[in-house]
């Protein structure tokens, strides 16, 4: 296994480039950091390409070689140069970008994000959707890149298990789903009490809007139901990920 010592090495430069969206799109790969996340990516069938590891992670690096990766050892300083965090976890690997699920193959229970920009919120909602029993994530224009390190770190492996779909026109996508039998439920401050909403049926999509502006007017028009969580204390609103989690679990409780 080759030992890399220079930050100018092509492998290091290529992996460092995966920290931004343009670099991922150009390379067709994304970065996964840490043993837990790397093992989950492998378990979910993603294709590994390159791995960079400190000496104490060499056993996993050899496993990645067995899975078809080109593995290298490197000092911590180079892991820090590649990592998206201040404290790298000793090993990182590049994987082929997974293809988004086509909207025509949409599953029954979907959470849709309309312009949710915060990577932590996107990843947390993804993870919660997986835990609650939702089957897919639909990302609209303006959302954080689902394959960014920050999103995947917050998703904690759910980003590999729960398929995602993407659309540049959320209202159009929701209209298509509605036409095919999905009930569109949108979280909105103008909506009715969430706990009094009618049963959405088997196929439904829960829409969560951006942290600052909520859902767009066009998305609002595409919804079958507008709902909001009651604020019984002094707070005016909840974090997008918290609100999404409450609604997802309540919707699944009734299944």
Regions found by a protein language model. Name each.
Residues 1-58, 143-144:
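Boundary-proximal intrinsically disordered activation/regulatory segments immediately upstream
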Residues 3-6, 70-75, 163-170:
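Short acidic-hydrophobic, aromatic-tinged amphipathic segments that line or gate anion-handling sites
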Residues 34, 117-124, 238-243:
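Amphipathic alpha-helical repeat scaffolds
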Residues 43, 98-191:
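RNA substrate-binding interface of SAM-dependent RNA methyltransferases
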Residues 65-96:
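Glycine/small-residue-rich loop that forms an oxyanion/phosphate-binding "nest" at active or ligand-binding sites
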Residues 74-75, 114, 140-141, 163, ...:
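Short beta->alpha connector loops at strand-helix junctions that form conserved
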Residues 93, 131-132, 146, 151-159, ...:
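Structured adenosyl-cofactor binding patch, chiefly the S-adenosyl-L-methionine
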Residues 185-235:
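Active-site/ligand-binding-proximal alpha/beta "capping" segment
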């Amino acid at each position: 296994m080759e030992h890399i010592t220079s930050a100018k090495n092509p492998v290091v430069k290529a992996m460092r480039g995966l920290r931004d969206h343009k670099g991922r799109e150009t390379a067709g790969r994304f970065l996964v950091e840490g043993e837990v996340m790397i093992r989950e990516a492998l378990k979910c069938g993603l294709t590994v390409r390159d791995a960079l590891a400190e000496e104490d992670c060499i056993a996993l690096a050899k496993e990645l070689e067995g899975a078809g990766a080109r593995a290298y050892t490197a000092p911590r300083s180079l892991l820090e140069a590649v990592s998206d965090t201040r404290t790298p976890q000793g090993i990182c690997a590049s994987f082929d970008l997974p293809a988004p699920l086509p909207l025509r193959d949409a599953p029954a229970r979907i959470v849709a994000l309309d312009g949710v920009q915060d990577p932590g919120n996107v990843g947390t909602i993804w993870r919660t959707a997986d835990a609650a029993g939702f089957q897919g994530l639909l990302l609209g224009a303006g959302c954080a890149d689902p394959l960014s390190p920050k999103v995947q770190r917050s998703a904690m492996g759910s980003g590999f298990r729960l398929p995602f779909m993407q659309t540049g026109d959320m209202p159009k996508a929701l209209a298509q789903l509605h036409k095919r039998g999905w009930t569109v439920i949108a979280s909105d401050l103008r909506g009715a009490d969430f706990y009094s909403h009618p049963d959405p049926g088997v196929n439904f999509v829960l829409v969560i809007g951006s942290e600052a502006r909520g859902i767009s007017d066009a998305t609002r028009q595409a919804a079958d139901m507008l709902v909001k969580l009651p604020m019984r204390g002094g707070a005016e609103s909840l974090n997008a990920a918290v609100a999404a989690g409450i609604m997802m679990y309540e919707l699944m409780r009734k299944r």
